[in-house]
From Swiss-Prot:
The chain crosses the membrane at residues 8-28, 82-102, 118-138, 161-181. It is found in: Cell junction, Tight junction; Cell membrane. Residues 1-7, 103-117, 182-209 are cytoplasmic. The gene is CLDN4. It comes from Homo sapiens (Human). This is Claudin-4.
Length: 209
């Protein structure tokens, strides 16, 4: 029962992380306009995401535009787009494997095969979490580096957007859920064989006497 509860908790955390990755991918808030002291860098708030950028006027009006080309993105956001999409696909595979190997499903009859499938699902979730945390941390590092770089113009300085925090939370959920699923140990099947072997030895010894 405890093993099933651990498994359900791991699947739930991983699914929440998977949904958070999709939210991180969709939100155009990887980079936002920076505020330096009490002065606003520009009269507009600029949001930059993986798929579009949005400009929010001081009046509250917002306009979003999809990137015309992949080359319009900075290098870190190009890599982030690829890794986040791969992470979503890999996590979807992990969800499928966790359903197949779940204790409360009948997709597999063998308990050992179920446990092994669940371990594979946990490893897949761990990989998905790593694929998210790498681009999010890379983008955050570049933002901080440019913010304190005196050679970068004030209008080009950005701050970390909400998508980065969502990405960190998503990677944490995926890593935690995958770690819990990897704790599913397959049942041992060598006990019956050892019992039969010992019984056969005792029978042979009695016949010899």
């Amino acid at each position: 029962m405890a093993s099933m509860g651990l498994q359900v908790m791991g699947i739930a955390l991983a699914v929440l992380g998977w949904l958070a990755v999709m939210l991180c991918c969709a939100l155009p808030m990887w980079r936002v306009t920076a505020f330096i002291g009490s002065n606003i860098v520009t009269s507009q708030t600029i949001w930059e995401g993986l798929w579009m950028n949005c400009v929010v006027q001081s009046t509250g009006q917002m306009q979003c535009k999809v990137y015309d080309s992949l080359l319009a993105l900075p290098q870190d956001l190009q890599a982030a787009r690829a890794l986040v999409i791969i992470s979503i696909i890999v996590a979807a595979l992990g969800v499928l494997l966790s359903v197949v190997g779940g204790k409360c499903t009948n997709c597999l009859e063998d308990e050992s095969a179920k446990a092994k499938t669940m371990i594979v699902a946990g490893v897949v979730f761990l990989l998905a979490g790593l694929m998210v945390i790498v681009p999010v941390s890379w983008t955050a590092h570049n933002i901080i580096q440019d913010f304190y770089n005196p050679l970068v113009a004030s209008g080009q300085k950005r701050e970390m957007g909400a998508s980065l925090y969502v990405g960190w939370a998503a990677s944490g959920l995926l890593l935690l859920g995958g770690g819990l699923l990897c704790c599913n140990c397959p049942p041992r099947t060598d006990k019956p064989y050892s019992a039969k072997y010992s019984a056969a030895r005792s029978a042979a010894a009695s016949n010899y006497v």
